[in-house]
């Protein structure tokens, strides 16, 4: 963080993405997108599930229909397709919690940071599970989901709303993201963005879309953040 000119940085709020950050779930989403879109005559390779991750589902569907069917679709049509994708996703094995993320959050709380989640998902079962799985770690009442914003990632709106709910300013806020569109959204909102590359995309996809720094798991994030904050404390004592 020092190399980004943040010698005096004092983060107060951390906004986590959900899929691919809190849960090791992206492989299931990618498969579900591929299978669901194929039913409607749309080719969506699994890798695109990672590229579009973070965007509201109906927006992803509208883009793919425009590209491959050559027409605009109604909100009802998009929702029908999204519900099919959700049905396939929920028929799969339940995604596990990302290794190291709870340890990272406990550390953040010990350093007086507040935490919530900003996700492009709007599925009630996932949001309910999120509040349950991370009870005591995240501020569940302030979660931002797809239903809370008109423009999803890569627009800054979800993260701007997250900061508003947490009473935080951009210069006090860290965004933790795994997806290019989410990284774009965090940067557009003015936050310091940590990219955690937990999927098959090259690191450059996160760096080129604006991640200030890229790690490969939550243990790396915790170690780096702890070193940085400890160095800050040493300066204060000096």
Regions found by a protein language model. Give the residues of each.
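Asp-based, Mg2+/Mn2+-dependent phosphohydrolase catalytic module
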Residues: 1-12, 76, 102, 106, ...
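N-terminal helical cap/lid subdomain that shapes the substrate entry/recognition surface
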Residues: 2-18, 22-111
């Amino acid at each position: 963080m020092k190399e980004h000119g943040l010698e005096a940085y004092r983060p107060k709020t951390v906004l986590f993405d959900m899929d691919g950050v809190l849960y090791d779930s992206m492989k299931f989403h990618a498969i579900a997108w591929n299978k669901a879109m194929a039913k409607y005559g749309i080719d969506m390779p699994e890798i695109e599930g990672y590229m579009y991750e973070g965007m509201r589902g109906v927006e992803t569907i509208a883009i793919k229909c425009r590209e491959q069917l050559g027409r605009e679709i109604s909100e009802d049509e998009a929702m029908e397709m999204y519900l099919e994708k959700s049905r396939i996703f929920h028929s799969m094995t339940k995604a596990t919690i990302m290794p190291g993320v709870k340890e990272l959050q406990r550390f953040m709380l010990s350093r007086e940071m507040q935490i919530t989640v900003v996700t492009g998902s709007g599925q009630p079962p996932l949001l309910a599970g999120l509040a349950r799985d991370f009870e005591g770690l995240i501020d569940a009442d302030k979660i931002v989901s797809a239903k809370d914003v008109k423009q999803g990632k890569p627009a800054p709106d979800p993260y701007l709303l997250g900061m508003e709910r947490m009473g935080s300013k951009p210069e006090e806020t860290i965004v933790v993201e795994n997806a290019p569109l989410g990284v774009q959204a965090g940067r557009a909102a003015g936050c310091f963005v940590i990219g955690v590359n937990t999927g098959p995309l090259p690191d450059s996809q996160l760096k080129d879309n604006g991640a200030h720094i890229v790690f490969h798991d939550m243990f790396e994030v915790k170690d780096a953040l702890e070193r940085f904050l400890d160095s800050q404390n040493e300066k204060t004592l000096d």
